[in-house]
Curated annotation (Swiss-Prot):
Catalytic activity: di-trans,octa-cis-undecaprenyl diphosphate + H2O = di-trans,octa-cis-undecaprenyl phosphate + phosphate + H(+)
Membrane topology of the entry: Multi-pass membrane protein
Protein name: Undecaprenyl-diphosphatase
Subcellular location: Cell membrane
Biological process terms in GO annotation: cell wall organization; peptidoglycan biosynthetic process; regulation of cell shape; response to antibiotic
Alphabetically ordered keywords of this record: Antibiotic resistance, Cell membrane, Cell shape, Cell wall biogenesis/degradation, Hydrolase, Membrane, Peptidoglycan synthesis, Transmembrane, Transmembrane helix
InterPro entries: UppP
Pfam families to which the protein is assigned, alphabetical: BacA (PF02673)
Molecular function in Gene Ontology: undecaprenyl-diphosphatase activity
Ranges annotated as spanning the membrane: 49-69, 92-112, 116-136, 152-172, 196-216, 224-244, 257-277
Miscellaneous comment as given in the Swiss-Prot or TrEMBL entry: Bacitracin is thought to be involved in the inhibition of peptidoglycan synthesis by sequestering undecaprenyl diphosphate, thereby reducing the pool of lipid carrier available.
Source organism: Macrococcus caseolyticus (strain JCSC5402)
Coiled coil: none
Recorded family membership: Belongs to the UppP family.
Length: 281
């Protein structure tokens, strides 16, 4: 691996860490930064290896979220004692939230991989996700009833879990769909975000681990450093991104992210349809 090749791994790891849990679609950013610009398939000598690299850096982001919420997971699993009295988020909330997307993923995973991973379909997901986020902010200007994740009901967990199914469409964004659903259910943005990230860790880890196991043969010994650099960058910037997002989301809400998504749609559309960059993805 040359220095400039490792810089590509660093850039993609940073992009993954910054975008995986923000409601801006990490898939859209990977198309823009990798498929249209850096093109790691040429660095790693195959599209399969490039796809495997994306799985590895996504795992870096997942570990970042797991680290941020480590005490919460330990509480839910009864490994660590709860520090406060009263209602608490429990394992059943998470399980209920995971059921809809888990079932849909098992049923349609192959179809999604074959038919929905293209630039036009991702652009549709980006745009529709942005519209949902705008609607969530516009139609929920009243006082929220659920101010912390510990106050949420099982019904809210189920509806948010159903909304997570929208994220099976590439580009829609898991956090965009679930935070929007939470806000429409009268949760404040921080509470909806907390549940989104906590719920995402187990299902994303399971999906990524399954994908990595199926593609492990595409990781070659002379490319290990490339994967390590990307993973570490995704983890570090994932931690920073999640902490910053959670500290700001109640103030800035979803609208700025929705506007950013629409700008991203325009940029990718111009490059793809106007200049033919990324054709064949």
């Amino acid at each position: 691996m040359t220095f400039f090749e490792l810089v590509k791994a660093l850039i993609l790891g940073i992009v993954e860490g910054l975008t995986e849990f923000a409601p801006v679609s990490s898939t859209g950013h990977q198309i823009l930064v990798d498929d249209m610009w850096l093109q790691t398939k040429y660095v790693l000598n195959s599209q399969e290896s490039a796809n495997t690299f994306k799985i590895v850096i996504q795992l870096g982001s997942i570990f970042a979220a797991a680290w941020i919420f480590r005490h919460r997971f330990l509480e839910v699993l009864h490994i660590e004692k709860t520090k406060t009295e009263g209602p608490r988020l429990n394992l059943l909330h998470i399980f209920i939230g995971l059921i809809p997307a888990g079932i849909m993923g098992l049923l349609f995973d192959d179809f999604i991989d074959k038919h929905l991973f293209s630039v036009p379909t991702v652009l549709i997901g980006l745009a529709l996700g942005a519209l949902l986020m705008i609607a969530a902010d516009l139609f929920n200007k009243k006082v929220t009833h659920t101010t912390t994740v510990d106050e949420m009901t099982y019904k809210q967990a189920l509806i948010i879990g159903v909304a997570q199914c929208l994220a099976l469409w590439p580009g829609f964004s898991r956090s965009g769909s679930t935070i929007s659903a939470g806000v429409l259910l009268k949760m404040n943005h921080k509470a909806a975000s907390d549940f989104t990230f906590i719920m995402a860790v187990p299902i994303m880890f399971a999906a990524s681990a399954k994908s990595l196991a199926s593609n492990i043969q595409y990781i070659h010994s002379d490319q290990i450093l490339f994967y390590i650099v990307g993973f570490i960058a995704a983890f570090i910037f994932g931690v920073l991104s999640i902490r910053l997002f959670l500290s700001l989301i109640n103030r800035v809400k979803l609208m700025p992210f929705a506007i950013y998504r629409l700008i991203l749609v325009a940029v990718i559309a111009v490059l793809y349809f106007g200049f033919g960059i990324g054709k064949g993805i």
